[in-house]
Amino acid sequence: MSTIEQTTTEVSTSGLSRRHFIQAAAATGIAIPFAQMIGGSSIGAAGKVFRYASQAQEGPAAPWMTKGGSLGILNAVGSWLIDVAPSGELKPSVATAWKGTNGGTTWTFTIRTDVKFHDGSALTADDVVYTVNSHLDPKNKSQSAAKLGGGVTCVKVDAKTVRFDLQKPNANFPYNVSSSNYGLLLMKNGVKGDESWIATMNGTGKWIMVSHKLNEKTVFKRNANYFDEAQIPSFETMEQIQYVSQSAAIPALKTGKLDSIHLLYGNEADTLPKTKFYKTLVPTCGGLHMHMRADIGQLTDKRVREAIALTLDRTAYIKGVLGGYALVANDSVMDSFPTADKSVPQRKKDIARAKALLAEAGVKNGFKLTLQSWKRDDIDKFTAFVKSSCKEIGIDVTVDLDGSDGGGARWYAYSVYPSVKGSKVANKGEWLASEFGIAEWAGRPVPDEYLNREWKSTGDWNPHYLDAPDLDAAVDAWLTALTPAKKKAASSLIQKASLKYTPIIVVYNETRVTVTSNKVKGVEFNQQGANWTSGTNA
């Protein structure tokens, strides 16, 4: 095993699981950004149909445009070079093998020759190269381009081989082209990945789209010609039904109109009878990220940002609101990974210190502040928690939530994209243009996307606009580290810089809870919310 391969195994595959779920506006919805939403049901069509709850969509189910809620759809119809298992391990998919050379700056992938698109045409190395380059082309404005990293090129070596050349070494690069980069499902050469793609959804996945109605229901039929026979679903039809809240989805599960609900609150799941339903848990590094603008507004002083963080009783929130189904986080995205520096002190509620920090910053009597996001169950609860917590130090928080489906009307309108360092964009009530806001992030098998896109000053999804060279340097150290020891050293630097500047508050890392009818067996989800196993009727 090469150094790069060993590093990937030791560091990456042992990690806990970006963005967009927990239980989304589908509070109970499944966010499945992977390639295998399968399972079984004795409900409907004599046990031939599997129905599951999904979150509301924030945008179209198109490769270049994919956002929360649409990910499950892409997951059903698409396939990737590599899959990510529930353990975080990389598993062969369209690529049967991959290897890093040249110190982690070159990655070569061997491609299967038996993969077919839903229209019957064969997938080739040319299709793989086209898919990658279509995302990298700036005119396509792909939401997934930044996940590949800067300075990446992809070329065809021969009919069975493609090669990626990187400007900087990256031991975790295979994750960038895996199912965790959900928009990068393989497309047919020349086909656009914009909204026009939705008409046919011509992918290579195990499900074929039959019908799709935005934010209502998508129906799929089994792909009997899927290249991995062992993974062909046992059910003929799958229905993804989108719900606005878990209170709507739970009754449907109880009455047999749904077979499974993913991303429930644990205490909600606990109310369901064990004689009829079973519960599965997956710890992740996902959850809600609350950003504070460091460039304009009332939160530019890091002492004020720290003061807000010190008002939050993390343990009490996890126990009282989340029913214990989460782990305490320490305002960084590194805390859940095995590379984390456990000696970094855990931030705890300290009202006296918070008040002192406000006094030092010249606002001892507090001020008025607006917290913005979009309306869904977990965000409703969390914003109430933040509002009451901040009140203890004199900060009067007004909560402003976008009530549109998936937050697409305003919060995730993306009129501001990408984030631009030094732009000082005005507050528009959007994720990337708000002084104080909350975005939901699904878990990732490695933290690279969080770091490169959300935390780094040059990130395209940087909502805080902090310009901190030492934090940037720590992120770069992580991204280029090729040994576990160097990864751990870089993680320590990131954790400490995150506490020093507090651009984002991360209170908890969620445990994803799934409840499934006992009439179905073998339903298992990975850390991002993808259904990994091929379930059957019990």
Residue ranges and their predicted role:
Residues T514-A538:
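Long beta-strand-rich cores associated with HINT superfamily self-processing modules
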Residues T398-A409, G422-N427, E440-A442, D448-N518, ...:
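Extracytoplasmic/peripheral linker and loop segments enriched in polar/acidic and small residues
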